[in-house]
Amino acid sequence: MLYNLLLPHIHNSHIANLFHYITFRSGLAIIITLSLSFITGPILIEFLRSIQKNGQPIRSDGPESHQTKVGTPTMGGIMIILSSCLSTLLLADLTNKYIWITLFGFISFGIIGFMDDYAKVTKNNHYGVRGKSKLLLQGIISVIICVLLEYLDKSPSHLLNVPFFKNLSLDLGYCYIVFAIFVIVGSSNAVNLTDGLDGLATVPIAFTAGSFALISYLVGNLIYSNYLQLTYIPNTGELTVLCAGLVGSCLGFLWFNAQPAEVFMGDTGSLSLGGVLGIISVITKHEIVLAIVGGLFVIETASVILQVYYFKATKGKRIFKMAPLHHHFEKHGWAESKVVIRFWIISVIFALIGLSSLKLR
């Protein structure tokens, strides 16, 4: 909004001219979301605590140390969604179609997560909304997003770019739409599975959002995209502002979510954040890079899939002591803080590998 209001005065005012630069608005987005989180965090946490008598239900079959988390409120993802959306509406170009499509998906996935968290809190169990119902709703939202992208793009690309290889891309035709839906839904649920310890998912999400802030900026810049031999996609640069807002809001949330957590982001946060990262990867045509940068999410998801299929195939045997993988290490005796920090280190490594694909090809 500020960008659109100041746009006519860019050449007449030095301050207005600053808003012409995506980098300036992105930095400002981080500052705004951090500030909003610090200011509204205590108020929101106290409100959630007052309306949630027992907080987020804790699994009885989980690590014993988790019983100390009883009474911790959930739905903290509301803080992330509100601060990110507000900074985006203030600083991004509101005539940009990608901004509105991404915000639509972000909020929609947040609503699905809120419904799940609400069901858990009111029923006082950790099951919430049925898995198939959530998948159906996620699928519907993803279909709408993909149809919008297909309809609004004058010449939509169905190419899947392969990182680390020069000029290597796969033409999926209209099957690309199915693939894009899979990416968005898969990303949403992968982040959700990772969010099982205090602060565990928050930092990797921030790393991934930061990586895609850079990717969005490069892909939306004709000079940089040509130099790096990336597919140039006009107007994606504005997503840098949104991604920067995600980074700031996640760091602000971490202030309250660090062990021992004062609040959990819940499915409200994890489903929305995973979904928005998937949407941005589809828009920027860096779906495979998302799987690399967010490699920790992939590993956590794979551990659950392997555990379920192995359990069924062997009629009761398990590969891991508990899935997702972070619980396996807890069952092995690792302290929660050690699991979290080591997984953060892994996510940094994956982010660096993913970003290196922009140049190494």
Curated annotation (Swiss-Prot):
CDD domains: GT_MraY. The keyword Membrane applies. One of its GO terms (cellular component) is plasma membrane. GO terms for molecular function: metal ion binding; phospho-N-acetylmuramoyl-pentapeptide-transferase activity; UDP-N-acetylmuramoyl-L-alanyl-D-glutamyl-meso-2,6-diaminopimelyl-D-alanyl-D-alanine:undecaprenyl-phosphate transferase activity. It holds the Pfam family Glycos_transf_4. The chain crosses the membrane at residues 28-48, 74-94, 99-119, 133-153, 168-188, 203-223, 236-256, 263-283, 288-308, 338-358. It is found in: Cell inner membrane. InterPro entries: Glycosyl_transferase_4 (IPR000715), PNAcMuramoyl-5peptid_Trfase (IPR003524), PNAcMuramoyl-5peptid_Trfase_CS (IPR018480). Pathway: Cell wall biogenesis; peptidoglycan biosynthesis. Its cofactor is Mg(2+). Belongs to the glycosyltransferase 4 family. MraY subfamily. This is Phospho-N-acetylmuramoyl-pentapeptide-transferase. It comes from Rickettsia rickettsii (strain Sheila Smith).
